[in-house]
């Protein structure tokens, strides 16, 4: 049975790529905001949600850490997607015709070298896939986009240069969300299980220290922890 997977962004977003890699036969459901992507799972419009929570270069993603606890959804798995940017333009364009590179502001910051080498002027767009769509619709051979290979396929753009990102270890961690609890997706069933906890401590000295001490005495490894003020 085909499952629907919601994600934030336009068709061709890296989140859609992640959804298709985890669920190859899924029906991707693009949503304009993270709130909409989470609501689609809560309301039953989607079986799962594919949500990015942190990037190896840019750090954690927006307000996700605030939205997830309030969503009431269950994290049933995670997926690490290597982020590979393609420099793309309309058919007939080439490296001598392009003058601008359009993409999300974070993506532009992760592709500085190629823009400097080609003397391209950065243009900020709402998201990576959206920049590919806009370039495609413009028909302008002087405009290029930095987006996923999937976006180039969807919007019928030619890839002028492949994998142009500054750092090859650029990776985004996604969590897979479900309205109902499920067994963690470990493949063979023998992998390490990761648990995500959200808790609040009292506003007293050493409260966090004492809370974390419980993990130490139980020999529980903490992969990461973050604190937020109320």
List PLM regions with ranges.
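N-terminal low-complexity segments that are often proline-rich with Ser/Thr-Pro
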Residues: 228-230
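Domain-level signature for soluble enzymes in the chorismate/prephenate branch of the shikimate pathway
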Residues: 1-226
């Amino acid at each position: 049975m085909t499952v629907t997977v919601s994600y934030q962004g336009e068709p061709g977003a890296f989140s859609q790529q992640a959804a298709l890699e985890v669920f190859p036969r899924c029906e991707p459901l693009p949503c304009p905001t993270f709130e909409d992507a989470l609501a689609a799972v809560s309301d039953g419009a989607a079986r799962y949600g594919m949500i990015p929570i942190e990037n190896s270069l840019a750090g954690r993603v927006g307000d996700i850490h605030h939205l997830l606890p309030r969503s009431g959804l269950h994290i049933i798995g995670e997926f690490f997607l290597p982020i590979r940017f393609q420099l793309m333009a309309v058919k007939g364009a080439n490296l001598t015709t392009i003058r601008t590179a359009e993409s999300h502001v974070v993506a532009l910051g992760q592709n500085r070298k190629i823009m400097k080498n080609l003397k391209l002027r950065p243009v900020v767009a709402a998201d990576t896939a959206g920049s590919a769509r806009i370039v495609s619709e413009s028909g302008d051979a002087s405009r290029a986009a930095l987006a996923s290979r999937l976006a180039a396929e969807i919007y019928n753009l030619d890839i002028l240069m492949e994998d142009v990102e500054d750092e090859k270890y650029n990776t985004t961690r996604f969590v897979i969300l479900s309205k109902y609890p499920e067994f963690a997706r470990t493949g063979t069933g023998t992998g390490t299980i990761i648990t995500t906890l959200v808790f609040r401590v009292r506003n007293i000295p050493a409260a966090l220290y004492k809370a974390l001490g419980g993990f130490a005495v139980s020999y529980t490894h903490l992969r990461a922890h973050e604190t937020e003020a109320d």
